[in-house]
Every structure is written in C-alpha cells, then in structure tokens.
A protein has these predicted regions:
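Conserved, well-ordered alpha-helix/loop/beta-strand core segments that scaffold catalytic motifs
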Residues: 194-227
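Alpha-amylase-like alpha-glycosidases and glucanotransferases acting on alpha-linked glucans and related
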Residues: 3-10, 15-17, 23, 60-199, ...
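Surface-exposed amphipathic alpha-helices with a cationic face
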Residues: 42, 205-213, 338-342, 364-365
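Outer-envelope exported proteins of Gram-negative bacteria
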Residues: 52, 218-220, 224, 298, ...
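Active-site-adjacent substrate/metal-binding segments within catalytic domains
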Residues: 14-18, 25-29, 51
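Conserved small/polar residues in nucleotide/adenosyl-binding loops
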Residues: 459-461
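Catalytic domains of carbohydrate-active enzymes, especially glycoside hydrolases
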Residues: 33-55
Length: 461
C-alpha cells in the first residue's frame, strides 16, 4: 500500500532523537519532556516525529551499532516517572550524582553511572512492590523472550570490563552450557536489574506512544539492516549469522568501491546465513519487526537494498574491494512480515539512497513502499538528478532536507562553491536563510510527507 494510503494528505514531520529532549539529568527521557515535545508538534500542525533507533548505543554513542536490536536505551529512563509510581523515593533523587546539563558534550560515564544507580534503587524497592506489579512484570518478560538473552549478555559484558563476547572465557561464549546456567543463577539480582530497567522503559515509552496517538502524532522509527557483531543478537543466535563459534567472521558486510572510495566501505558486521533464516521461517526477523511495531507506527528501513542483495566480503579482508553480490530473500521475508501485520500493507519507508539497482527498485515497488529523497543531494547542476524537486514524480516519497548522515543545511550551504550558490539562488529564489528556503522547497514537492531535522526548525517551533 503506497504512502498516500497511510498519509491521507500532505503532511509534515520533524527528525529529532529523544536525546535532544530537554529536562533529563543527562539527556532526554521518556517523561514529561517528551510529552511537551509532542504537544508542540501538535500545536504547529506537525503530524510525524521521526527518530534514530531507540536501542542502546555502542561505545561511540551510535544506536546503529547496538548491543541489542530489541532493547531500549537505559539513558531514556525517566526518574520522575519512577518516583511518581512509587518505584523509587523522591529522597533518592538527591543521591544520583552529577548531571550532564553543565557540559557542552554528552558524557557517557555520567549516563552509565546514573543507570547503575537507578538500577540498584529499583532492585532495593522491588521486594516491597505489589503482587500485581510483579505479575505484570513476569508476564512482560515471558512475552519478550529477547530480554533474557539481553540481560544475561550485558551482565557478562560488565563482568569482563566490556570486552566483546569473543574475548570472554570459553565457557561464556556459548549460550546454554551447564557452567553458564549455574553462573546465571548466582548473578540473578544483576540480571533482574537489567530486566526491570527494560520493563520500565517499555512502560514509559508505551505511555508516550499512546499520548502521541491521542494528539494524532505518528512515530517513525529506524531499523538498521545489519546488527553489531558484539551484540546479544549474535551471541545468542550464532547460527543465523556468518560467524564462527569463537566469534571470528566468516563473511562481513560492506559496499564495493565507488566514486567516493577506492577501497569501498567495510562495515565489519556479520552477514546473514539466509538459508538458516529460511529454515526457521524467518522467526528472528519477524520477532524483530514485531518488536519495532510495538514501539512505532512507521519504520524507516536502513540499507533497504540489503533485502534485495548485499555485498559479501571475506571475514579476514581489510578492505571491501574483493567481494560478491549475493541475493537476499527480501520478497519472502516482507510477505511474511506483511501477513504478520494483518496482510494489508507494510508501514515501512525504504532507505534507498545511493546507487540503487533495478532489483532493489522492483522490490520497493512490489510492496508499494515509499522511498527517500534528500534535497542536499539535488543541486549538482545535473538536470536529471533524481533528487531535484522537479524530478520527484508521484506522491509515494518522503522528502528530507537532510538526515542524520548529512551536514546541517547551514553547513552544507556554506561549503557550496559560489557558482553553485548563485545557480540555486537564481532558480529557487533562495532567501538569506538557507534552512528555511530548503524547508519551503521540500514542502512544495509532490511528496505526501516532508521531514526536516530539528535544527532547521528550532527558530520556528
């Protein structure tokens, strides 16, 4: 079903990750600040809120390389909500340590220490919680089977100073061995903390999602195609990935050389053993999609071309020069996901940027998925450029000024040469404010949905 069946009229959205929401001790949270943000969107007639993956980040702060493709980032846990519901005491708030609010950058150590302190407080108060709450928690854990593996994985990582799982002692590398089962029992409290944090995050986000629905705001999430090698997903499901039991890569992901890189891009994530996914009826993938649609209304699928075919590189390669294109069973997978969702349509935005081959375009069109158009890519002087506003045909597109991968519009504009700036000004009557000019151009295209990153909208909201 095309985008205009999901979006009945020309609509506007803003791209902003929850970390940017004001009010939290270290970053934005799933609390009052998120609801206030939704109120602002509703007030200004903006109907879509898009964000990056809500998953935990890696050590560099990237949610695209997460230790779990199912879990939520503990940094988003809202303390005031926990106090209001009686899970921790208001007096505990004074002992949670420093905040990040007086810094000009995000301090991961402060965020992680805060999470640990909140986790200990939740554990201390858990025994005094009502039986009804404990029953609800246990039901949630049973419904979300991924949380057992995730909680265990994170506790083991912390035990070994955050080393990747392939550097752990041998008895910890393999899930479900006798030694590990015994160790898990000894670490039951630490594992319970991780589960409690995920449960509270899920409850808080569910409240945010319902609040957004009451204001007619739809949430657009983000799903990376690949998952991190150092993740609970890979550790607990090794047979689904091109990886040896000891953690060495059999094959890894990337893209071949192009105009921008003579050696290609080597991403280092394991590729999928699609034959195993087929034999298991795509169970892991279907659960992954199911989890995402618990959290969001629409999903941007990153590296959509991977569902048609992917560049496979040997696990020990140092560049992506030598590799092979391998077909993916994307059509079969998407049909199963579509059926799981009721069989009507797939609320997915296909990230189809870069060099897109006919098989990728065919897959997108077969499922009537909207693609993406980035205006910052449009103005290279080529009249056939597919990102030029006049070349955006039909309504089944989502137009962006830029995404998280782009520079801000101001930076993009300042880095254009004089001739490019002059040409754009002459043709598009650019004002002195390039950000607002690009927003106006985006709103004027045929596409049913236009989305701008937050920094372009700050002055107007």
């Amino acid at each position: 079903m095309p985008l205009d069946s999901i979006i009945a009229k020309k609509s506007l959205g803003v791209l902003m990750h929850p970390t940017c929401i004001p009010g939290g001790r270290v970053c934005g949270t799933f609390g009052r600040g998120a609801k206030e943000w939704i109120r602002k969107l509703h007030k200004h007639g903006i109907e879509y809120w898009q964000f990056l993956p809500l998953t935990p980040t890696d050590s560099t702060g990237s949610p695209y390389s997460s230790p779990s493709s199912f879990a939520l980032n503990p940094w988003f846990l809202d303390i005031d909500n926990l106090i209001e519901k009686g899970f921790i005491y208001i007096s505990d708030k004074e002992n949670l340590g420093p905040t990040n609010q007086d810094k000009d950058h995000f301090d991961f150590a402060i965020a992680d220490n805060l999470t640990k302190k909140i986790g200990l407080l939740l554990l201390q108060g858990w025994s005094s919680q009502s039986e009804e709450r404990k029953i609800n928690f246990n039901k949630w854990v049973r419904r979300h089977s991924w949380v057992e593996d995730f909680a265990t994985f994170v506790v083991i990582r912390e035990e070994f100073n955050m080393l990747p799982w392939w550097e752990w002692p041998r008895e910890f590398k393999i899930k479900n061995n006798k030694f590990l089962k015994s160790w898990i029992k000894k670490k039951s409290e630490e594992i319970l903390i991780k589960k409690l944090i995920q449960w509270h995050l899920d409850e808080q986000w569910s409240d945010i999602k319902n609040f957004a629905k009451s204001r007619n705001i739809k949430l657009i999430g983000d799903l990376p195609f690949y998952v991190s090698r150092d993740s609970a997903d890979v550790w607990s499901n090794k047979s689904l990935f091109s990886i040896f039991k000891n953690g060495d890569l059999i094959f890894q992901s990337g893209v071949p050389p192009d105009y921008f890189s003579s050696t290609g891009q080597l991403w280092g994530t394991p590729t999928y053993f699609w034959s195993k996914h087929k034999r298991t009826n795509f169970n892991w993938w279907r659960k992954r999609f199911q989890r995402q649609f618990e959290l969001v209304d629409i999903l941007r699928f990153d590296h959509f071309r991977g569902l048609a075919g992917y560049w496979r590189v040997n696990g020990n390669s140092k560049t992506a020069i030598i590799g092979k294109w391998i077909n993916s069973p994307g059509k079969t997978l998407l049909n199963k996901v579509k059926k799981d969702l009721g069989g009507n349509y797939l609320p997915i935005i296909a990230e189809d940027l870069g060099v897109i081959t006919p098989d990728v375009e065919k897959l997108r069109k077969n499922f009537e998925l909207p693609g993406m158009k980035i205006l910052q890519f449009a103005f290279d002087g080529n009249e056939d450029n597919p990102y030029l506003p006049k070349n955006i045909e039909g309504e089944n597109w989502v137009v962006y000024t830029g995404t998280h991968d782009n520079s801000t519009t101001v930076s993009w504009w300042e880095n254009l040469d004089y001739e490019s700036q002059r040409r754009i000004k002459d043709e598009y009557k650019f004002s002195e404010n390039p950000s607002w000019a690009l927003i106006e151009i985006g709103m004027d295209t045929n596409a049913n949905l236009f989305i701008a990153p937050l920094q372009l909208s700050l002055i107007h909201i």
